[in-house]
Amino acid sequence: MLQTAPARSCAPLTARRCRNCWPARSAAGWLRLDRTAIEVDHCAAGALPIVALIAFLLGLILAMQAYVQLRVWGAEIYIADMVGVSVMAEIGPLMTAIVLAARSGSRNAAQLGAMVVSEEIAALEQMGIRPLAFLVAPKVVACAFAALALSIVFDLVAMCGGALFAWSVAGIELDAFAEQLRQALSVSDLLVAQGKAATFGLAVGVVGCALGLRVKDGSEGVGRATTNAVVLGIFLVIVIDAVFVTCQRMLVG
């Protein structure tokens, strides 16, 4: 009779193959750059049209409200100051983070929650693949990068909207508007605003992924995690913004 060799588990071999076939990893091996690029494309490129539209309309609205108040004293030129400072310091990073929480935070929670329910996360762990490196880290880094990039776009488009209103209604030339913006804003303002935006994006990414990985109760739990990711993400962003403003005022004195 033919003797058959005892069956051996292929899990260790599969795990080794999966670990060795990961392309485009960082030097530390903790972040998959190829997956991060895909997530950045979804977070940033996917949200770009709605962010640009909101920014343009808010720039128009802010300039309109400022014009109503400033024309009483003949100080219409300061429309640029009000639009530039308010957009860069607060509205730009906040609105970008809110859009990101609604789109990417909810998506991350739903995607990871569905993977938990279908036991895909457990399967990755059995194969020796770290879910934090394979799934979570790319999403969190992508949210931070997308928030930074979208905040810059938001600021530029909103100021264009404000400049368009100032030129068409208040009679302010575009070069005068730009010069007033240059005087009102500084490099430190830009750095603080973009640091704030990146922190907001990081918070949105962490909240969405954390809630997704903690899903229980099947599809109902996925829906609950998705809703909570948006609500908690926006709440956390506002809390972080309050901390930023408080610390900034304490340092400035």
Each model region followed by its residue ranges:
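Membrane-interface helix starts
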Residues: 26-36, 41-53, 234
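Membrane-interfacial helix-loop-helix connectors in multipass membrane proteins
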Residues: 64-89, 156-198, 202, 206-228, ...
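Short cytoplasmic-facing helical segments at TM-TM junctions of multi-pass membrane proteins
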Residues: 111-137, 219-222
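Membrane-embedded translocation segments of transport machinery
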Residues: 76-114
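Hydrophobic alpha-helical transmembrane segments of multi-pass membrane transport/permease proteins
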Residues: 50-65, 242
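Short, membrane-interfacial amphipathic segments enriched in basic
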Residues: 1-36, 211-212, 216
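Selective transmembrane-helix segments that form parts of the transport pathway or gating/packing helices
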Residues: 44-52, 136-159, 230, 234
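Final/C-terminal transmembrane alpha-helix of multipass membrane proteins
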Residues: 222, 228-246
